[in-house]
Amino acid sequence: MRVPYSWLCEVVTVGAPDWDVSASDLKQTLVRIGHEIEEMITVGPVDGPLTVGRVTDIEELTGFKKPIRACVVDVGDGQQHEIICGATNFVVGDLVVVAFPGTTLPDGFAIAACETYGRHSAGMICSAAELRLSTDHSGILVLPPGTALPGADGADVLGLDDVVFRLAITPDRGYCMSVRGLAREIACAYDLAFVDPASDQAVPPLPVGGQAWPVTVQPETGVRRCALRPVTGIDFAAVSPWWLQRRLLLSGIRAISPAVDVTNYVMLELGHPLHAHDRNRITGGFTVRFARPGETIVTIDGIERQLDPVDVLIVDNVTTAAIGGVMGAASTEVRSDSTDVLLEAAVWDPARVSHTQRRLHLPSEAARRYERAVDPAISVAALDRCAMLLADIAGGTVSETLTDWRGSPPRADWSLPPIRIAVDLPDRIAGVVYNQGATTKRLTQIGAVVVDTVSSEGHTLTVTPPSWRPDLLQPSDLVEEVLRLEGLEVIRSVRPLAPAGRGLTAVQKRYRAIGKVLAQSGYVEILPTPFLPADVFDLWGLPADDPRRTTTRVLNPLESNRPQLATTLLPALLEALVSNVSRGIIDVALFAIAQVVEPTEWTGGIGSIPVDRRLTDAEIALLDASLPRQPQHVAAVLAGLREPRGPWGPGRLAEASDAFEAVRIIARVSGVDVFFRAVQYLPWHPGRCAEVFVGETPIGHAGQLHPAVIERAGLPKGICAIELDLAAMPIVEGLPAPQVSPFPAVLQDVSLVVSTQVPAQEVQDAIRDGAGELLEDIQLFDVFTGSQIGEDCKSLTFALRFRAPDRTLTEDDASAARDAAVRHAAERVGATLRT
């Protein structure tokens, strides 16, 4: 938002005539009370002669690629000065501003007489942008008739001794998007009396005699107030005076016509947007309603726009007059032949205005104010101020009729709910002892009504926020206002004492250990996005009842196509994999450790959460019940070569066994034993996927991904992945050091023939269970299929290591344990000993 320093000073000094502060000091004060000033722009200065002139003749020069005009300008010295100019937005008789040779413009450009386009040019006709009055480069600056006489000092006429502040107004401080709001802030900061420019003192109420225009409002539209007043008999050919045009230019708005200019001016002054309709183009009364499916509107920029049923419209009996709070329609736009206007001041729903203007890509100064909330108490004052300005500038008569729709039933006042606050709460929160009465003083300054109460419960204040401060909802908001206006610099910076170190928790230790061991195994960690692409589960082909489809939707997502919080880490890992592969990095191993969000069945509502006291146990339990479950997962993906090619061989592609090994190293560092069971679970390959168990508790899945899923993702074949729920894995603290037997081991091999449908893991588990405690380790080292084995069969060869903790094993001891393992495998999985 841009606002001139001179305009702020004018409004502030109404209540404090002796107040005088420089622009730089005012900037520091605004920053001190919490406003972000992005830039302080100096208007001008111009060094050298800058003169008002009147154009007396224009000759169009031909033979050039762009319009060139030889202009004769009278500057009151009795001479005719020829100046070459490329702008075409002025005519003979217009007042312009001329810079003569020897003048240096604000950007450092020096004016000199020169020969150009075959003619002599004795200076330059200036644009508003060249004088830093605005950023509009579309043409030269044309002054309204009667602004000054030719020969007048241009710097004095234009007011080139001003400063413009460019502020970034936060969403909760919509009241500051006006001179009214900022002037009040300045008065608070300097402890000045303040006269509200929207008060009856500043805007005397106009007479009211009857309804101006019938209006019907659908209650669901969220409109809080709608005021209408006609102004008849205006002269559309009139031009807004320079003082008004100047303030619009400095605020970043181009002057268009009196009807449009005064609505923009009052919006900047009071913060309440208005709209001017051509009354003679309105048929019947106004209705405020939602758009109908398929409905369109041609807005004042001449573009036909497709509406949505959530858009709010103003319509008459025939056509649409405006998109509420966003833009007017061409059908009721004021034009060059308009004589009667109907001024409208409405208070639209902030959320609906924000949604509509973003969807239609129609950002506007009005919409920026509506989406931050507009003061409904000043709608009629803004309307009357606008009507009187329009009548003064363009003639005409302000009608005594007024429509003021205030809701159904009509609302008598616009006060906000009162807030109770302990008088010393700001002191306790800031750790500062403020002067007695500081809290009451500061809250009164911002416009609140404060009632002081002393009772058995203590000294409290009942604070009713003003109608323009809907952001004040709870005691902490009031505390912020007191601290802000008293000065944050008085709050001491005290370094908090760190508690004695207690070390990492068991969960944190496991987190670090897993990350470390995966990194040592060649995996690279990424930070996964917490949001899911909307169509990812459809691409995976998950059934409709899959739990992973039950997601938590974010109301205001960072990206519209990612509205859901992730229930799995795999989509983010696969996206990272795609990004790497698309850049030619095809041998990749990635992992992530992060939380996923699993919604609960909670359907209750949560009210406002107090921040000025400790929550009760019941409130904490309610919050806990409403929160979705957020377990920590670890996931990894592998693509390309797991073992690189080189002089030693061609390398080895990643396969399902690498995924299983990743699970084992995670289990090993976590101090748990895992086993695998074959399962069908998308997005994994149905024949190359295993469910991972700790005891009888499933903790995740591992294996090779489904070829169709890989193809849809644009990845090469053979991608492997794991995902484990660490919250389901028991925490093992203080892992004991493994006992090392001093006795030698006995090594034996065993080959078993089983059906090809039997997973090797089940055979291995059967051998381990059957061999007993003497079996120290088992490794599968060979898989063989062929006619010698039999159809639909495979041979699995395991290396067995036997060792006793208290004696030296004999070959007979080891053979007996091996035979027991073979018998157990035969009973459990139908294995036979290969001979």
Swiss-Prot record:
The UniProt record lists the keyword Metal-binding: yes
Cofactor comment text: Binds 2 magnesium ions per tetramer.
Catalytic activity: tRNA(Phe) + L-phenylalanine + ATP = L-phenylalanyl-tRNA(Phe) + AMP + diphosphate + H(+)
Family membership noted in the UniProt record: Belongs to the phenylalanyl-tRNA synthetase beta subunit family. Type 1 subfamily.
Record-annotated FDX-ACB domain positions: 741-834
Subunit-level organization: Tetramer of two alpha and two beta subunits.
EC number: 6.1.1.20
Pfam families named among the record's database cross-references: B3_4, B5, FDX-ACB, tRNA_bind, tRNA_synthFbeta
GO cellular component, one term: phenylalanine-tRNA ligase complex
GO MF: ATP binding; magnesium ion binding; phenylalanine-tRNA ligase activity; tRNA binding
Biological process per Gene Ontology, one example term: phenylalanyl-tRNA aminoacylation
Residues bound to Mg(2+): 471, 477, 480-481
Primary enzyme class: ligase
Residue ranges of every copy of the B5 domain listed in the record: 414-493
Species annotation: Mycobacterium leprae (strain TN)
UniProt entry keywords in alphabetical sequence: Aminoacyl-tRNA synthetase, ATP-binding, Cytoplasm, Ligase, Magnesium, Metal-binding, Nucleotide-binding, Protein biosynthesis, RNA-binding, tRNA-binding
InterPro entries assigned: aa-tRNA-synth_II/BPL/LPL, B3/B4_tRNA-bd, DNA-bd_dom_put_sf, Fdx_antiC-bd, Fdx_antiC-bd_sf, NA-bd_OB-fold, Phe-tRNA-ligase_IIc_bsu, Phe-tRNA-ligase_IIc_bsu_bact
Subcellular location, record wording: Cytoplasm
Name this protein carries in UniProt: Phenylalanine--tRNA ligase beta subunit
Cofactor field: Mg(2+)
Main location: cytoplasm
Every tRNA-binding domain range: 44-158
